[in-house]
Swiss-Prot record:
UniProt: IMP binding residues: S335, D370, G371, G372, G393, G394, Y417, R418, G419, M420, G421, Q451
Active-site residues from the entry: C337 (thioimidate intermediate), R439 (proton acceptor)
PROSITE patterns for this protein: CBS (PS51371), IMP_DH_GMP_RED (PS00487)
Official protein name in the record: Inosine-5'-monophosphate dehydrogenase
Enzyme Commission no: 1.1.1.205
Amino acid sequence: MSAFKPYTEALEVLKKYEKKDGLSIDDLIRHNFQGGLTFNDFLILPGYIDFVPNNVSLETRISRNIVLKTPFMSSPMDTVTEDQMAIYMALLGGIGVIHHNCTPEEQAAMVRKVKKYENGFILDPVVFSPQHTVGDVLKIKETKGFSGIPITENGKLRGKLVGIVTSRDVQFHKDTNTPVTEVMTPREELITTAEGISLERANEMLRKSKKGKLPVVDKDDNLVALLSLTDLMKNLHFPLASKTSDTKQLMVAAAIGTRDDDRTRLALLAEAGLDAVVIDSSQGNSCFQIEMIKWIKKTYPKIDVIAGNVVTREQTASLIAAGADGLRVGMGSGSACITQEVMACGRPQATAIAQVAEFASQFGIGVIADGGIQNVGHMVKSLSLGATAVMMGGLLAGTTESPGEYYVREGQRYKSYRGMGSIAAMEGTGVNKNASTGRYFSENDAVRVAQGVSGLVVDKGSLLRFLPYLYTGLQHALQDIGTKSLDELHEAVDKHEVRFELRSSAAIREGDIQGFATYEKRLY
């Protein structure tokens, strides 16, 4: 038997190998023995760890001038991002892109709510009138998840406050037709505070009152805002919050189309304080989008333009040349999208990200992986291929902060979710030229051709729990790879220090759960 080498020579022996273990990104993407790749087709090989996960920075650039503390973006879909989603995305270090399947005035109002948001103050609470009933309160509790509702004379914000009703007032009340005035806490028994109070003082006042809600009123006793003890406890510290450097307001983006009336829409959004505009199209390489990019850069030079969607170098070059500051990558890869099936057009998402990012990185352009993101692993793979951010639609659709009501089936809570190419979205606003038809170039079609589906997704709870889980998961993944930041990850991939491995179908099965008769997959 031949003698083994001394263990002290292991590192020297390793140097004799001509190539590092695994594949470089060039080997992975530019091979000629396999078609396009998606996330489950490969893995990232582990590196060397000499730091703890908490030391990993996820700071990233989503566009030429916007840097965030996390790479998270919410998709401009009407069942994903409105003002509540955008507020909490920004508080947690990401940014929300408010959909445009609504009137320009409604969209601008949502942008304004995000910009005016101050942690803890609820500026658009649900408000009831004295004519509402106990049944109405119970319905709000079931569909919205809360029941502390102020009562005003006209049932609107800035109406004269007459009382407040909470879950304690109605939980044992059997007659659902009873007016809320018979069970509510009347105005004279309420503790309120005056408009203009600082959050710190209001917080202290709410704590001392030992109440769950604190109404904020003006000099005429009209309701102007509401404070919630639960929200205040959640909102005390957001160290990652995405804020502008000058005004310290939360950052927000919004989507528009490429029609002439979208220029009027953008004027309202800019007036509301928009930080970035996303030109929303399934196929971005069009004369319409190029013309729109040039017009925006000339008219609103301080607003970053995120263009797309693209999946090829040629598309990418066209939009960069027009002036795009960031690009969305993906065509037909979204969970609610059937473009590849119906149109036979698109590209596997991993290959699309790698090809676009390789070209766009030469120009300092943000690259946003948009579609196909189902878990933390997919995010890590997107970022390792050159993406600087990930956009989530279906992954966020079931959260508390997404628009829409809850549905309960067989004891499980769901929320509605639909692709913007679905028939439901195309017909949802009752307006022929809505955001969905514009996105898929079908405004003038007599017959609709769906490129998406609609349905229900399981309730995921609050973004306040879900996004920190994603953030921590990414930190641990980068630790396994051996890189301390996203910039370091991209640099290590470019230098071929980070290595990859293709997976066979059997290898994919091996990486899945095996051997259990039953199991619970609890992620956080």
